[in-house]
């Protein structure tokens, strides 16, 4: 990719991104902030061409800090390879080739920059970065893009397996994980696949297990969260790592940057006509879409409830909606292929967020003080949903885990109308205040970001 001209360099940081899901974007957000704070340090950002193309626009060079250089690495897919359709196949191919691909591109970047890399800042998934850092005499800074609960589940995988037993797990799914301080309300069935159930021998499961074993070797581990959200887990994790830093919510830290709000479908203008706390915002992220029957149930529940709504739904899924739904609800709500989520969750009219409970979405909802209705699918989403409902008490999981017309209607009524919903809103507002306090100039997340800057470039 085209690279900005370089000022004089004092140090060189290699940033290694995981190019799947929503991992690369928050790592780039952190990289931009660090680069702006340390203009004499070069940050070489390594990612696949496909992922980079979605992160950087053609005119991005003008806005990108001059000390960020962008490199494309191979995706690990052999020439002429035919995908079999196996789940996580692309991830497996990438991971198998990643260590050598990263080494090769880092060497190229060192030649171009004229400065050896002295810090590897990577997605925490890259357990092999521990050995890479040792090889080149560099520090390793790892970024966990999800929450403290899921990080703890992977850090303590061996302990959980020893306590629960992988063979007996089917009989113990409802038990809570009391053996880990801060996870006493988390059930076995809430843990991500690959901890004690699912395919423990998959490439992805083994990667997460190796990650949990390797992370204590890192110079520092940082996370997109804030300390008051999980204080007990924060203290626990701080005792396990050389340095553990909550630097989020990143969405609030980056809000100081002047960014033009993209709203091509007029969602925010539509919201201006709605009363405070009345609108249901519905989005399940960029990776998953509920199955057809659940999409129909959501539509039927919305129509029957009369609740105003903004629904972010891929165009290819519109055919799954009940016939005539869009026409009948034209005055009630809007269905759009993309919505400005952060701005919608900050809007006074938003009363509930119907979500898959991906970590970025949860944190954005917390930052907006908006209660949630959760429909988790995989990974850390069940953990996040459990925390939303039982730990923080700022929402609820959909009844019986899947959308039905009646179940969804009851959830909307509970959150938007009933006293339970008022309590959720109150709790969400308190967490919002703590989130903003954390990123204030003297807040803990701001202080931790300065600590991260120190760990990465040693300029303080």
From Swiss-Prot:
Keywords: Glycosyltransferase, Phenylpropanoid metabolism, Transferase. Pathway: Flavonoid metabolism. Flavonol 3-O-glucosyltransferase that catalyzes the transfer of glucose from UDP-glucose to the 3-OH position of quercetin and kaempferol. Possesses high quercetin 3-O-glucosyltransferase activity in vitro. Catalyzes the glycosylation of anthocyanins from UDP-glucose. Also active in vitro on benzoates and benzoate derivatives. It comes from the Eukaryota. An anthocyanidin binds at residues 23, 88, 154, 379. The active site is at residues 23, 123. It catalyses: a flavonol + UDP-alpha-D-glucose = a flavonol 3-O-beta-D-glucoside + UDP + H(+); quercetin + UDP-alpha-D-glucose = quercetin 3-O-beta-D-glucoside + UDP + H(+). GO terms for biological process: phenylpropanoid metabolic process. InterPro entries: UDP_glucos_trans (IPR002213), UDP_glycos_trans_CS (IPR035595). This is Flavonol 3-O-glucosyltransferase.
């Amino acid at each position: 990719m085209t690279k900005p001209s370089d000022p004089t360099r004092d140090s060189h940081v290699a940033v290694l991104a995981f190019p799947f899901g929503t991992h690369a974007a928050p790592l780039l957000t952190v990289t931009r902030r660090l680069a702006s704070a340390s203009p004499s340090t070069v940050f070489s950002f390594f990612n696949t061409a496909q992922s980079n193309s979605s992160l950087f626009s053609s005119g991005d060079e003008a806005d990108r800090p001059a000390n960020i250089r962008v490199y494309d690495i191979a995706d690990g897919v052999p020439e002429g390879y035919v995908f079999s359709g196996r789940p996580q196949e692309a991830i497996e191919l990438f991971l198998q080739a990643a260590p050598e691909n990263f080494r090769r591109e880092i060497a190229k970047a060192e030649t171009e920059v004229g400065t050896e890399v002295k810090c590897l800042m990577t997605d925490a998934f890259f357990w092999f970065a521990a050995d890479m850092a040792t090889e080149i005499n560099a520090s390793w800074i790892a970024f966990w893009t999800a929450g403290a609960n899921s990080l703890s589940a992977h850090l303590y995988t061996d302990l959980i397996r020893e306590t629960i037993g992988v063979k007996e797990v089917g009989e113990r799914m409802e038990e809570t994980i009391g053996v880990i301080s801060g996870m006493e309300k988390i059930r076995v069935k809430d843990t991500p696949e690959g901890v004690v159930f699912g395919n423990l021998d998959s490439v992805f499961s083994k990667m997460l297990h190796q990650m949990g074993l390797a992370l204590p070797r890192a110079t520092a581990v940082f996370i997109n969260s804030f300390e008051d959200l999980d204080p007990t887990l924060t203290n626990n994790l701080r005792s396990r790592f050389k340095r553990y830093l909550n630097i989020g919510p990143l969405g609030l830290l980056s809000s100081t940057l002047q960014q033009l709000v993209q709203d091509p479908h007029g969602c925010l203008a539509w919201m201006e006509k709605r009363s405070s706390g009345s609108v249901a915002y519905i989005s399940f992220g960029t990776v998953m879409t509920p199955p057809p029957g659940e999409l129909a149930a959501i539509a039927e529940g919305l129509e029957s409830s009369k609740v105003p709504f903004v629904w972010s739904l891929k165009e290819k899924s519109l055919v799954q909606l009940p016939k005539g739904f869009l026409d009948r609800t034209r005055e009630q709500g809007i269905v759009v292929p993309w919505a400005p989520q952060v701005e919608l969750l900050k809007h006074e009219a938003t009363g509930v967020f119907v979500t898959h409970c991906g970590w970025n979405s949860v944190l954005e909802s917390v930052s907006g003080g908006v209660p949630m209705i959760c429909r988790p699918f995989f990974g850390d989403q069940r953990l996040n949903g459990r925390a939303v409902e039982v730990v923080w008490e700022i929402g609820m999981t959909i009844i019986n885990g899947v959308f039905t017309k009646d179940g969804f209607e009851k959830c909307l009524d509970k959150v938007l109308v009933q006293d339970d919903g008022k309590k959720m809103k109150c709790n969400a507002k308190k967490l919002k205040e703590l989130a903003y306090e954390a990123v204030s100039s003297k807040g803990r997340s701001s202080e931790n970001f300065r600590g991260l800057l120190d760990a990465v470039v040693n300029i303080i």
